[in-house]
Curated annotation (Swiss-Prot):
The keyword DNA damage does not apply. The gene is rplL. Pfam families: Ribosomal_L12, Ribosomal_L12_N. It comes from Pseudomonas entomophila (strain L48). Signal peptide: none annotated. Keywords: Ribonucleoprotein, Ribosomal protein. This is Large ribosomal subunit protein bL12.
Amino acid sequence: MSLTNEQIIEAIGQKTVLEIVELIKAMEETFGVTAAAAVAAGPAVAAAAAEEQTEFNVVLTEAGDKKVNVIKAVRELTGLGLKEAKEKVDGAPQVIAEGVSKEAAEDAKKKLEEAGAKVELK
């Protein structure tokens, strides 16, 4: 005789919580599975995406005390004129380089930090 889903649910509904826990353990052993709750894949997917990132934005977050040196570094990295570079530095946070490789982004970050700026890679 085969039980229907309704009959199984009705039988489980008549059991105590302790009996249901024992039933779950027995089913795990019998079928070689675990009854762990499914975990949302959001954080894992985000972490994988962060590892696969190939393009970076270099963001000047703060000019620091050595503003003149930072302006020179921005000019060197971007090819901007003095006025445009000063406007970028004065308007921090500003994107200095967009869609560059990891190596280029790290080099730009290093140059800007050596000049006295605070920089983030995004």
